[in-house]
């Protein structure tokens, strides 16, 4: 987007011309927001690493912002880029703070796109942690696909786990 790129260049100019100043600090804060909104957190990390002054971009913050950027794309209803962003998040942060959330969204996107393999993969990842907030929904989606594939014993096992969760 042209507007983003122009704003980025203007803020970069402030940071490089006035390193260490309050203006540079505010410019970096605004740059971070722009890059998150544009789903380009990796570019911000690279930029922060090369900028002069006391600029730090911690890995935990990069983890969080990468996830937040992907979630924003999903919330806009853009399933394909969201799928790509969540997949990239999981590749970069396989045990990241938001990995369960990312697997959940990929599971939902898979269901929306009728991609049974994606649903099974990501629901399976969610079910590795049976007490997570998404486990009931994951059991339901997982069991439904197994049932439709006539894998009744496996589907029944999922439904029994779901029943046990729903009654507790």
Walk through the language-model features, giving the residues of each.
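Acidic, polar-rich low-complexity tracts and alpha-helical solenoid repeat scaffolds
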Residues: 1-168
């Amino acid at each position: 987007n042209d507007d983003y790129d122009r704003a980025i260049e203007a803020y970069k100019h402030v940071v490089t011309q006035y390193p260490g100043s309050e203006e540079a600090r505010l410019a970096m804060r605004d740059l971070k927001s722009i890059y998150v909104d544009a789903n380009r957190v990796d570019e911000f990390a690279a930029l922060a690493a090369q900028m002069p002054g006391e600029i730090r971009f911690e890995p935990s913050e990069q983890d969080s912002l990468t996830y937040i950027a992907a979630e924003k794309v999903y919330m806009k209803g853009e399933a394909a880029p969201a799928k790509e962003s969540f997949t990239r998040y999981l590749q970069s942060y396989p045990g990241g703070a938001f990995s369960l959330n990312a697997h959940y969204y990929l599971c939902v996107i898979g269901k929306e796109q009728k991609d049974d393999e994606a649903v099974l993969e990501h629901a399976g990842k969610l079910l590795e942690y049976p007490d997570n907030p998404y486990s009931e929904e994951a059991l339901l989606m997982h069991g439904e696909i197994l049932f439709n594939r006539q894998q009744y014993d496996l589907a029944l096992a999922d439904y029994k786990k779901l029943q046990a969760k729903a009654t507790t």
